Amino acid sequence: MAPITVGDVVPDGTISFFDENDQLQTVSVHSIAAGKKVILFGVPGAFTPTCSMSHVPGFIGKAEELKSKGIDEIICFSVNDPFVMKAWGKTYQENKHVKFVADGSGEYTHLLGLELDLKDKGLGIRSRRFALLLDNLKVTVANVENGGEFTVSSAEDILKAL
């Protein structure tokens, strides 16, 4: 499947997360992104070094600035189960705006065309590192990394595009 690109409508599919009442929710991407400006940024795995030390902290640190520029939702996305994503999210005590969601089976990652084969590292099929800016479901920015790079998908890169 070809990777999602600028101008595409983000595919519908389901993601899972724990809500503020600690209840597991499984919702469609369209239900949380329709009519909104949403940043969906993907990482190869929870608790992995680049994701944990650079990618996620960048979005947490810039969340207020992103919100001030009209962003309604900031979503961190990974092919992990929702329990792992919940635990990972709790490690960022300063986080007030980034929602940690799971694509447990990798099905949504496949719909996006952003799969990354990390079987040789014992991680299976994961998500490429990326940052998408969605405006009422339409992709207006698609910053997708190659391999394990972290050069175009930061919060700063999204801010430059706003």
UniProtKB/Swiss-Prot annotation:
Localization annotation:
Cytoplasm
Q: How does it assemble?
A: Monomer.
Q: What is this protein called?
A: Peroxiredoxin-2D
Q: Which residues form the active site?
A: 51 (cysteine sulfenic acid (-soh) intermediate)
Q: What does this protein do?
A: Thiol-specific peroxidase that catalyzes the reduction of hydrogen peroxide and organic hydroperoxides to water and alcohols, respectively. Plays a role in cell protection against oxidative stress by detoxifying peroxides. May be involved in intracellular redox signaling.
Establish whether keyword Oxidoreductase is in the entry. Answer: yes
| GO (cellular component) term, any one | plasma membrane
Task: Choose any GO biological process term that the UniProt entry carries and state it.
Answer: cellular response to oxidative stress
In the record, what terms sit under GO molecular function? thioredoxin peroxidase activity
Its Enzyme Commission number(s) read 1.11.1.25
**What is the taxonomic lineage of the source species?**
Eukaryota, Viridiplantae, Streptophyta, Embryophyta, Tracheophyta
Annotated source species: Arabidopsis thaliana
Q: Which InterPro entries match?
A: PRX5-like (IPR037944), Redoxin (IPR013740), Thioredoxin-like_sf (IPR036249), Thioredoxin_domain (IPR013766)
